[in-house]
Amino acid sequence: MSKLFWAMLAFISRLPVPSRWSQGLDFEQYSRGIVMFPFIGLILGGVSGLIFILLQPWCGIPLAALFCILALALLTGGFHLDGLADTCDGIFSARRRERMLEIMRDSRLGTHGGLALIFVLLAKILVVSELALRGTPMLAALAAACAAGRGSAVLLMYRHRYAREEGLGNVFIGKVSGRQTCITLGLAIIIATVLLPGMQGLAAMVVTCAAIFILGQLLKRTLGGQTGDTLGAAIELGELIFLLALL
């Protein structure tokens, strides 16, 4: 299990993980690592939250929010943001399904992808700033949001098909069991409710799961399935929706 955790941490983040810590683990086994996603989100969000706390007394809330969101993007290597941009470029091209998938494979950034990145990053910075002004504990909020975003992404894996013949997302999409889905969502809910007081964390998690489930159904109808890009989009939007639900 520890090998699986380190493999997942290296897979969806840019944190340095020695290769020997996950040595001997086959790529086909990665689907079992979905239950680790909320914990990885907890770590990434915790680092981002610490950066906010350290910088806020020095440069104020707006700049601290900017740098903590920038840190979060750097910690993931922009992996999920790239998926968000590619998904929006494809979906909003208003082409046939096959052409949408081709556009999503294109490494060049299109207008819709650029607008999506600007909107999501700016929205995160503004929401984090507003939450801090309202006295929300930002370490807890960011850690819970990142756990929720990664945990809710399982809703685009369970009982979904892969829209392409090959790709990284094929490791998870359609390969996750109902038990793994329940465990992943359960862990994300526990993290959110423990970190945030009262029913705030639970309510935000319910809103996030509902929104990501609807997103998954819309993407399934449009693309005929999911891809690694749509998983990245779900994670980014899940984080934002969770933070918005805390307002």
From Swiss-Prot:
Pathway: Cofactor biosynthesis; adenosylcobalamin biosynthesis; adenosylcobalamin from cob(II)yrinate a,c-diamide: step 7/7. Its EC number is 2.7.8.26. One of its GO terms (biological process) is cobalamin biosynthetic process. GO terms for molecular function: adenosylcobinamide-GDP ribazoletransferase activity; cobalamin 5'-phosphate synthase activity. The keyword Transmembrane helix applies. It catalyses: alpha-ribazole + adenosylcob(III)inamide-GDP = adenosylcob(III)alamin + GMP + H(+); alpha-ribazole 5'-phosphate + adenosylcob(III)inamide-GDP = adenosylcob(III)alamin 5'-phosphate + GMP + H(+). Its cofactor is Mg(2+). Keywords: Cell inner membrane, Cell membrane, Cobalamin biosynthesis, Magnesium, Membrane, Transferase, Transmembrane, Transmembrane helix. It is found in: Cell inner membrane. It is a multi-pass membrane protein. The chain crosses the membrane at residues 34-54, 59-79, 113-133, 138-158, 171-193, 197-219. InterPro entries: CobS (IPR003805). Joins adenosylcobinamide-GDP and alpha-ribazole to generate adenosylcobalamin (Ado-cobalamin). Also synthesizes adenosylcobalamin 5'-phosphate from adenosylcobinamide-GDP and alpha-ribazole 5'-phosphate. This is Adenosylcobinamide-GDP ribazoletransferase. It comes from Salmonella newport (strain SL254).
